């Protein structure tokens, strides 16, 4: 990896407008922060990004399944060893169940080590007579409702880098150091089935997985792949000063990569075809995703393919659909049909979270577990009818026992939300709800064969 200022400085079109960017009050402080980031070592390597691209190509071809999960918005305070371990543990547990249900390898991607910024509907928030800048994630400002806390501070971008580095260090230690051993993960899942009041429903599948592992052990099969896993990082490429400052020229190929994460996506609110985010995504060689909401037209989808993957490189482009449970069965089919007919190679992933948010009577933002599940069901039904591959799921989750989404086997109610509502932004599935979803999606994967 090299950082060649001449080629990088001319890489991106500076004349384009960028949506959802903070109004940094101190331009010289921003310049200093960007200069510091430009001098930092890469958080990931281009070769790792290429490996992920190859895995995504397999998933797009129906030979793997994508599991992406993590916080809605990471916070500096929650970047603790326990919190990171619990999130990884939850994703590994989900992956083991999905892998068995699908009889396919599962690509494990954390929505972590960089997901510190969020787009907002309004630039300002008003409480009583006081109006302050909206909270845009720890990358920009602080959740506390004071003028100093809400003033965008570019030094936070440097803190994002260091916190992401520490997170990735733990991720690598946990996934390569024996913590991710498939047999250990299965023991955790057995514990979930035994201890959870909804576990009985999933006991049969857990027992099947146990018998399969016992059979392999009896046959002397103990591959290294059981002991370690590849775990990739991802986040929304939102704050362009950060993403551009961490773009490097790969010394092997001379091509630019965003080395802040293996995979980045462009959000529903920033995917303007003539905008700076789309220009950024076009120029980097990482595998990239684009969020597609219910207003997406066929023309939008086909134009994005043409702009972002003109050579139809397998693994380059992932469409993450966020339609809402009530829309997915009507809006998704024409999009999938048109893209398939065009011959484009795209991985289709379902985000069943963002189209299903509503405000509870108490004022908390929440989501119904049944809506989340129904959108995934609709996603699978659409692909089943069209003969295409339901390539993966994108879930906002935590490894902790929070009470942010209602329903599920624990029957969390609107009245329970206040018990442990900890998210910095949108509501997340807790550990139990995440595992319950994995078992239910595993049943869908098994039934689709």
Predicted regions: what they are:
Residues 301-304, 310, 316-348, 354-403:
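Non-transmembrane, aqueous-exposed alpha-helical and coiled segments at domain scale
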Residues 62-63, 348-350:
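Short coil-to-beta-strand
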Residues 67-72, 109-112, 350-353, 396-398:
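Short loop/turn segments at strand-loop or loop-helix junctions that form parts
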Residues 51-53, 274-277, 304, 333-335:
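Glycine-rich, charged/polar anion/phosphate-binding loops
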Residues 407-408:
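C-terminal structured domain segments
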Residues 56-59, 97-99, 280-281, 382-386:
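A general structural signal for short secondary-structure junctions and capping/turn motifs
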Residues 2-66:
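N-terminal basic/disordered segments at the start of proteins
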Residues 74, 79-324, 367, 375, ...:
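Active-site-facing alpha/beta catalytic cores
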């Amino acid at each position: 990896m090299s950082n060649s200022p001449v080629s990088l400085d001319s890489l991106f079109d500076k004349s384009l407008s960028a949506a959802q960017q903070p109004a940094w009050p101190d331009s010289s402080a921003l310049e200093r922060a960007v200069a510091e980031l430009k001098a930092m070592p890469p958080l990931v390597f281009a070769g790792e990004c290429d490996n992920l691209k190859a895995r995504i190509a397999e998933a797009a071809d129906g030979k793997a399944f994508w599991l992406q999960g993590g916080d809605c918005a990471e916070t500096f305070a929650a970047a603790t060893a326990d919190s990171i371990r619990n999130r990884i543990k939850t994703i590994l547990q989900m992956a083991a169940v999905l892998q068995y249900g699908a009889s396919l390898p599962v690509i494990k991607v954390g929505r972590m080590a960089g997901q510190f910024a969020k787009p907002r509907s309004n630039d300002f928030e008003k409480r009583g007579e006081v109006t302050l800048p909206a909270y845009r994630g720890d990358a920009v400002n602080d959740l506390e409702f004071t003028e100093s806390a809400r003033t965008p501070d570019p030094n936070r971008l440097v803190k994002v880098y260091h916190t992401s580095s520490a997170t990735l260090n733990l991720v690598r230690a946990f996934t390569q150091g024996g913590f991710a051993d498939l047999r250990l993960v299965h023991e955790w899942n057995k514990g979930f089935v035994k201890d959870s009041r909804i576990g009985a429903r999933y006991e049969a599948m857990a027992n099947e997985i146990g018998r399969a592992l016992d059979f392999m052990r009896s046959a002397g099969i103990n591959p290294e792949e059981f002991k370690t896993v590849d775990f990739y990082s991802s986040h929304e490429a939102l704050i362009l000063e950060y993403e551009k400052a961490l773009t490097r020229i790969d010394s092997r190929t001379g091509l630019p990569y965003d080395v802040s994460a293996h995979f980045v996506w462009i959000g529903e609110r920033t995917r303007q075809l003539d905008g700076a985010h789309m220009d950024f995504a076009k120029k980097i060689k990482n595998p990239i995703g684009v969020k597609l909401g219910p207003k997406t037209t066929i023309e939008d989808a086909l134009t994005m393919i043409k702009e972002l993957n003109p050579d139809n490189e397998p693994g380059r482009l992932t469409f993450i659909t966020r339609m809402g449970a009530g829309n997915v069965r009507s809006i998704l089919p024409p999009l999938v049909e048109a893209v398939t007919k065009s011959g484009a190679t795209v991985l289709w992933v379902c985000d069943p979270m963002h189209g299903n948010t509503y405000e509870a009577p108490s004022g908390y933002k929440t989501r119904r577990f049944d809506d989340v599940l129904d959108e995934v069901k609709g996603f699978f039904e659409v692909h089943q009818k069209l003969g295409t591959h339901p390539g993966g799921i994108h879930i906002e989750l935590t490894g902790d026992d929070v009470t942010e989404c209602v329903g599920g086997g624990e029957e969390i109610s609107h009245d329970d939300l206040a018990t442990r509502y900890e998210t910095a932004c949108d509501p997340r599935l807790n550990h139990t709800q995440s595992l319950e979803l994995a078992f239910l999606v595993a049943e869908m994967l098994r039934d689709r064969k």
